[in-house]
Amino acid sequence: MSKSRLTVFSFVRRFLLRLMVVLAIFWGGGIALFSVAPVPFSAVMVERQVSAWLHGNFRYVAHSDWVSMDQISPWMGLAVIAAEDQKFPEHWGFDVASIEQALAHNERNENRIRGASTISQQTAKNLFLWDGRSWVRKGLEAGLTLGIETVWSKKRILTVYLNIAEFGDGVFGVEAAAQRYFHKPASKLTRSQAALLAAVLPNPLRFKVSAPSGYVRSRQAWILRQMYQLGGEPFMQQHQLD
């Protein structure tokens, strides 16, 4: 290898190492800070806002209103757990059984990819990472998930998730969603309304709360049944998530 190639290789390696250190400090600081402080915006919100501006849509505003868990209806937390991650109180950030099932499904159905992301993984991804599918992003997501599972309580993870989840075009967080679709604060959401919001996850740009399709209504009904089977509100109290 020539001296010039060695120099370039050495430069690239040093740059990547420094970048990794900077990102580790940035993400580690974010995990520590947001363990107690409200989250003002997420990476997904920034991505959506920048994309809108680049497409000339200057009326788009990614909007979120932070609320604490005691300002969120317990039905809402239960609904997203029933819909997205029923083992949330028990696992350490990853649902291994669901991952194995998803991998087996995806091998058989290449055109219908099934995910197995837990609420913890979705929180890490939405808060810190870009959208899309790649092994690099998945690796970073895994590391960040371990970080928030180590530093945050399950209640904190659920609180952040509910405050940054996307529920529609420019609608981020359960408070903004409750006000937009039901004209009430998140604390007043009913069981049925919470299930409807959860029914559009994790694809709220395709499925609409304001104009629910037959699929969304069917999923809402399924979520309501799962909420009942989990035990209703006592489930949240039992696992100290309310």
From Swiss-Prot:
Keywords: Cell inner membrane, Cell membrane, Cell shape, Cell wall biogenesis/degradation, Glycosyltransferase, Membrane, Peptidoglycan synthesis, Transferase, Transmembrane, Transmembrane helix. GO terms for molecular function: pentosyltransferase activity; peptidoglycan glycosyltransferase activity. One of its GO terms (biological process) is regulation of cell shape. The keyword Transferase applies. It is found in: Cell inner membrane. Its main location: membrane. It catalyses: [GlcNAc-(1->4)-Mur2Ac(oyl-L-Ala-gamma-D-Glu-L-Lys-D-Ala-D-Ala)](n)-di-trans,octa-cis-undecaprenyl diphosphate + beta-D-GlcNAc-(1->4)-Mur2Ac(oyl-L-Ala-gamma-D-Glu-L-Lys-D-Ala-D-Ala)-di-trans,octa-cis-undecaprenyl diphosphate = [GlcNAc-(1->4)-Mur2Ac(oyl-L-Ala-gamma-D-Glu-L-Lys-D-Ala-D-Ala)](n+1)-di-trans,octa-cis-undecaprenyl diphosphate + di-trans,octa-cis-undecaprenyl diphosphate + H(+). It comes from the Bacteria. It is a single-pass membrane protein. Pathway: Cell wall biogenesis; peptidoglycan biosynthesis. Pfam families: Transgly. One of its GO terms (cellular component) is peptidoglycan-based cell wall. InterPro entries: Glyco_trans_51, Lysozyme-like_dom_sf, PBP_transglycosylase, Pep_trsgly. The chain crosses the membrane at residues 19-39. Gene3D superfamilies: Biosynthetic peptidoglycan transglycosylase-like (1.10.3810.10). Its EC number is 2.4.99.28. Signal peptide: none annotated. NCBIfam families: mono_pep_trsgly. Peptidoglycan polymerase that catalyzes glycan chain elongation from lipid-linked precursors. Belongs to the glycosyltransferase 51 family. This is Biosynthetic peptidoglycan transglycosylase. It comes from Escherichia coli O127:H6 (strain E2348/69 / EPEC).
